[in-house]
């Protein structure tokens, strides 16, 4: 009996530790193939954010209690972040965008660190945090690039393009290249950190499946939060840079 319990426990731990990279479960939607496992975990993240938002704000009180405290703290945190990075005149309209980015990335990262997605079986590949897929992080980075282009162009019109030859015309190639490196750095930084964290935890659980991986998992929670903050902060900084006046 003891041997059976030990074997079943070991099998469960190894199932948790199993890591498969580059394998995807595809859904066919019309002519397009999409990563089904990313959509499933993304819907879970959206549901968590929606449930917490509704639960925390359905019965607002003058003196906040419970989840209302949490939602107000998050709102103030994102508002201060936007104000710091974008400036007092323009920051208000960008709070929803930065807040959505931060919450989606934060909950996605923490879902990968806290939920043993690997034990849920799908026909191919495995479930993981949405930000563990390069397609998700690239999409978030391109969305950020679109946002700061829109911010600059909507405020300055064609004058926005003067930034490419400022302070000197010979800097044009460097400034153009910078617009390509920004989304690259955003996407690969987030993807690399989340993937590396899940791989390290998976390997440690396979090698030493008791208490040794726990500090790494706790560090992963901290890193996951930092990555969400870094992404949202850089997004705000890029938007602020695109709308500031160059002299």
Curated annotation (Swiss-Prot):
TM annotation in the entry: 36-56, 95-115, 134-154, 199-219, 220-240
Major location category of this protein: plastid
The keyword GTP-binding is assigned to this record: no
Listed GO MF terms: proton-transporting ATP synthase activity, rotational mechanism
Membrane association type: Multi-pass membrane protein
Compartments, record wording: Plastid, Chloroplast thylakoid membrane
Pfam families: ATP-synt_A
Family annotation (InterPro entries): ATP_syn_F0_a_bact/chloroplast, ATP_synth_F0_asu, ATP_synth_F0_asu_AS, F0_ATP_A_sf
Similarity comment text for this entry: Belongs to the ATPase A chain family.
Function: Key component of the proton channel; it plays a direct role in the translocation of protons across the membrane.
Subunit structure: F-type ATPases have 2 components, CF(1) - the catalytic core - and CF(0) - the membrane proton channel. CF(1) has five subunits: alpha(3), beta(3), gamma(1), delta(1), epsilon(1). CF(0) has four main subunits: a, b, b' and c.
Protein name per its UniProtKB record: ATP synthase subunit a, chloroplastic
Name of encoding gene: atpI
């Amino acid at each position: 009996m003891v041997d059976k319990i030990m074997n079943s426990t070991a099998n469960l731990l190894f199932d948790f530790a199993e890591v498969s990279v580059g394998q995807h479960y595809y859904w066919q939607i019309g002519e397009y193939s999409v990563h089904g496992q990313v959509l499933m975990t993304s819907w879970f993240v959206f549901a968590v954010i929606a449930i917490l938002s509704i639960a925390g704000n359905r019965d607002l009180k003058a003196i906040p209690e419970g989840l209302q405290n949490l939602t107000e703290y998050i709102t103030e945190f994102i508002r201060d972040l936007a104000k710091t990075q974008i400036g007092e005149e323009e920051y208000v309209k960008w709070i929803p965008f930065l807040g959505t980015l931060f919450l989606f990335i934060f909950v996605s990262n923490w879902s990968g660190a806290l939920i043993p997605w690997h034990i849920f079986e799908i026909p191919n590949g495995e479930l993981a945090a949405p930000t563990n897929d390069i397609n998700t992080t690239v999409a978030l980075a391109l969305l950020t690039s679109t946002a700061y282009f829109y911010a600059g162009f909507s405020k300055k019109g064609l004058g926005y393009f003067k930034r490419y030859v400022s302070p000197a015309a010979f800097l044009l190639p460097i400034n153009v290249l910078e617009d390509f490196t920004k989304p690259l750095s955003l996407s690969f930084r987030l993807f690399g950190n989340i993937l590396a964290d899940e791989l390290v935890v998976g390997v440690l659980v396979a090698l030493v499946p008791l208490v040794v991986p726990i500090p790494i998992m706790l560090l992963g929670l901290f890193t996951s939060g930092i990555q969400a903050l870094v992404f949202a902060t850089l997004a705000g900084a890029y938007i602020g840079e695109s709308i500031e006046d160059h002299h």
